[in-house]
């Protein structure tokens, strides 16, 4: 064992190498100094030095993901993208006060869903077999009782025509809570499964979104099944958007493995789909909606099955920071719960000023906050390039303007990116790169002046993978922030 006197001598020696040394690292180092031999000391010191070099305790950053903001040139915008066409004076100021690059959130050739994309953008990269599935993440996010062996799926209320062709995969998107809850209750009460005592929870969340949990008490259900939603493939638990046509039907759920529990699970999902279409068709709620000239809630398209709770390290441990978040949607709420992030209340989806003020205030108690703004993605899915441009302008005026008015940019860094692109011309997610900006008074500008897809290609950050963004941003900040800032 080393005496305290020897420890302090070593600390003083090492201190000369690290200008950003602080009391936090002294305590951390003391933990590594319980060495029993010189060899043990060398090994422990290497670990400690790596941690000192990654010390983020003096960094404050606000990390904003603009859902689906990336896009492609569009004829309605004279061949520009919504980011390029938008009037964004505050975003321009932020970009001019930093450096820019581009990001492929999950991987080349993968048009990701938001869940896996956000995990990657927060630094978590999964092998396909290790991912729990969006269904589980959303079940956690909405507070459904879930345990390993249950089956959780993400669902969409959708509209079918008389030939059961999908005419609107979101049933008009805006669905009254009374109608969504009423249909869900009918399904829970009326669906009868072939396996006795199998129970179902149907939980409507926001708009057209639904989370479904199936529990068969005598069976462990499998996540190795296909989606009934024809717009997405299940690739190792990860939802990947497919290129699809206009005449789509609810797909039959199939086992992805020739094993009993996958076959049993797919049968249960098909029983749910087939019975729910009949129940919903005859529902008094849909009769009322027809009289009101509203879109029918004809079926629930299911995707992204999961059967186990995710096993990942907390984000504070991963990045050596005290993280918090502002999120609205069930999937992001689930991610915050899984990663042990404190979630701040900050109004509704479009309460942009409130979100900005809460994010700025969070810098008093946390040194990082992740803010997820949903708006741009929905316009991308609707193919509305002008609407997407206007939404970006609204976010610039209401969120980013309020944010910069409430933070000290000499002390707080702003990182802005997206979870994926949602090109209006495709009406779906794509693997196209999205911009990333790292901005603060102490960050050297690389000559870029706007956060756009084209300028991102010229920025000094280069091309990153999504799982690298937080780490690379922190490296950039540490390399340029003043000691003891």
Residue ranges: model-predicted function:
Residues 5-16, 31:
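Polybasic, lysine-rich low-complexity intrinsically disordered segments
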Residues 34:
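Nucleic-acid 5′ end/cap handling module spanning
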Residues 30-31, 51:
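Enriched - but not universal
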Residues 1:
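Flexible, polar/acidic helix-loop-strand segments at domain edges
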Residues 10, 18, 37-485:
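Feature captures the catalytic ectodomains and active-site-proximal regions of enzymes
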């Amino acid at each position: 064992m080393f005496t305290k006197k020897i420890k302090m001598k070593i600390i003083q020696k090492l201190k000369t190498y690290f200008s950003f040394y602080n009391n936090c690292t002294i305590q951390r180092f003391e933990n590594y100094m319980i060495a029993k031999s010189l060899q043990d000391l060398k090994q422990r010191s290497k670990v400690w030095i790596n941690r000192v070099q990654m010390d983020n305790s003096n960094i404050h950053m606000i990390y904003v993901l603009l859902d689906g903001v990336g896009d492609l040139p569009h004829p309605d915008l004279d061949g520009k993208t919504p980011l390029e066409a938008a009037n964004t004076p505050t975003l321009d100021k932020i970009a001019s006060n930093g450096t820019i690059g581009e990001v492929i959130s999950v991987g080349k050739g993968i048009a990701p869903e938001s869940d896996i994309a956000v995990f990657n953008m927060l630094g978590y990269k999964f092998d396909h077999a290790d991912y729990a599935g969006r269904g589980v993440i959303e079940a956690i996010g909405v507070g459904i009782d879930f345990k390993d062996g249950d089956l959780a799926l993400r669902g969409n209320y959708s509209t079918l025509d008389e030939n059961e062709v999908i005419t609107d995969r979101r049933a008009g998107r805006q669905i009254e809570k009374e109608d969504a809850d009423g249909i869900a209750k009918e399904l829970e009460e009326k669906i009868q499964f072939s396996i006795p005592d199998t129970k179902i929870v149907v939980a409507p969340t926001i708009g057209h979104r639904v989370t479904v949990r199936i529990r068969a008490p005598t069976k462990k259900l499998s996540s190795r099944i296909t989606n009934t939603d024809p717009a997405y493939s299940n690739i190792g638990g990860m939802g990947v958007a497919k290129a699809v046509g206009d005449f789509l039907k609810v797909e039959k759920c199939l086992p992805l493995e020739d094993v009993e529990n996958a076959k049993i699970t797919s049968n249960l999902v098909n029983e749910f789909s087939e019975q729910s279409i009949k129940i919903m068709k005859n529902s008094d709620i849909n009769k009322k909606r027809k009289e009101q000239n509203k879109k029918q809630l004809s079926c629930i398209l299911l995707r992204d099955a999961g059967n186990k709770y995710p096993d990942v390290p907390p984000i504070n441990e991963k990045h050596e920071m005290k993280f918090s978040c502002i999120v609205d949607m069930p999937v992001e709420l689930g991610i915050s719960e899984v990663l042990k992030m404190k979630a701040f209340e900050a109004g509704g989806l479009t309460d942009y000023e409130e979100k900005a003020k809460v994010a700025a205030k969070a810098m008093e108690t946390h040194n990082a906050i992740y803010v997820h703004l949903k708006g741009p993605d929905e316009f991308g899915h609707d193919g509305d390039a002008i609407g997407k441009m206007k939404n970006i302008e609204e976010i610039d005026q209401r969120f980013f303007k309020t944010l910069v008015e409430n933070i000290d940019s000499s002390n707080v860094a702003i990182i802005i990116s997206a979870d994926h692109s949602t090109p209006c011309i495709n009406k779906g997610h794509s693997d196209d790169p999205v911009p990333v900006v790292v901005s603060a008074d102490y960050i050297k500008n690389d000559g870029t002046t706007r956060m756009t897809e084209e300028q991102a290609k010229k920025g000094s950050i280069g091309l990153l993978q999504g799982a690298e963004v937080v780490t690379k941003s922190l490296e950039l900040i540490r390399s340029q922030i003043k000691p003891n800032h």
